[in-house]
Amino acid sequence: MDLQTEIGKTLKQARRAKALSQAALAKLAGVPQSHISKIENTGVDLRLSSLTELARALDLELMLVPRKVVPAARSLIRQAQPTPISLTKPALRDD
C-alpha cells in the first residue's frame, strides 16, 4: 500500500472512530467535503497544511519516526487502540 492510500485509510478510520461525517470533519478542518472524500477513497497527494488540519481535527499527532523503529511504533499504537467493533456483524448480547 502506498503512503497516500495508507494516510487516507488512517484518516477514514479516525473519522469513523469519532463518529464524524465527512462533512463534519471538513468543517472542523476547514477543507471541502469533496476533498475529504478524495483523500479517503483515492489516496490523493495531500499538502502538509491540509494533513496538519485534518490531524488536528481528529485529535491525531503527526510524527516523523526513524524507519528502523516503525515496526515497534506500529506495535505500540496497536496495543494502545481498543479492539474495533465490526460494523458488518451484529454485536453479541448477554441477555
Q: What does each of the following model-derived ranges do?
A:
Residues 65-95:
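Short, charged recognition helix plus adjacent turn
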Residues 9, 34-37:
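Positions in alpha-helical segments
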Residues 19-35:
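Short alpha-helical DNA-recognition segment
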Residues 1-6:
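A detector for short, charged/polar N-terminal pre-domain segments
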Residues 49-65:
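DNA major-groove recognition helix of helix-turn-helix/homeodomain DNA-binding modules
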Residues 9-24, 53, 84, 89:
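Short basic helix-loop element that most often maps to the first helix and adjoining turn
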